[in-house]
């Protein structure tokens, strides 16, 4: 290939805009149901696969991909990441451990759902939820958690600088 053609191709590649992401807004949505019978908070967290892979790779200091990384290795890294970025503390400050249930992929929607539980013997009222998942990778990340305890419902929204909220149901 002649030198001018190579230079033109290189200039075209460098001048081209970056590939568009599948979505322009970075969000996660969680459903957190308090199960009074088991005294656990049952959480289902939805993230976009590409967003999660990017944040997980930075956190793990190595490239991790849902398609290429062995499932056990990916899940172990995902558990560690979620335990660091999605936490719940009881009203007296005790950290509720994250108990892994599993994950599911919805390829058509580019969605990855994580399922985990957190023991909360005293209930969810007054607990502090800290949710900063993906925020270190995407400054405009918006995370929401829909908390339910029987008939009581509450939605918590977490922005870049607002990563902790207290569960307070209206009377």
Q: Where are the regions a protein language model picked out?
A:
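Bacterial N-terminal signal peptides that target proteins for export
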Residues: 1-12
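Compositional signal for N-terminal targeting/processing segments
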Residues: 2, 20-22
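N-terminal signal peptide c-region/cleavage motif recognized by signal peptidases
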Residues: 16-17
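N-terminal soluble domains immediately following signal/targeting peptides that reside
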Residues: 22-171
């Amino acid at each position: 290939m002649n030198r001018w053609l190579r230079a033109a191709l290189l200039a075209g590649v460098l001048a081209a805009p970056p590939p568009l992401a599948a979505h322009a807004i970075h969000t996660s949505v969680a459903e957190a149901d308090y199960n009074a019978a088991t005294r656990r908070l049952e959480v289902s967290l939805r993230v976009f696969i590409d967003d999660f892979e990017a944040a997980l790779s930075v956190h793990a200091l190595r490239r991790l991909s849902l398609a290429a990384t062995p499932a056990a290795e990916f899940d172990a890294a995902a558990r560690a990441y979620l335990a660091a970025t999605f936490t719940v503390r009881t009203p007296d400050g005790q950290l509720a451990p994250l108990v892994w249930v599993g994950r599911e992929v919805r390829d058509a929607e580019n969605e990855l759902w994580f399922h985990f539980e957190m023991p909360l013997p005293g209930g969810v009222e007054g607990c502090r939820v800290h949710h900063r998942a993906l925020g270190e990778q995407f400054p405009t990340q918006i995370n929401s958690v829909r908390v339910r305890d029987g008939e009581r419902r509450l939605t918590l929204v977490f922005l870049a600088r607002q990563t902790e909220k207290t569960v307070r149901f209206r009377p």
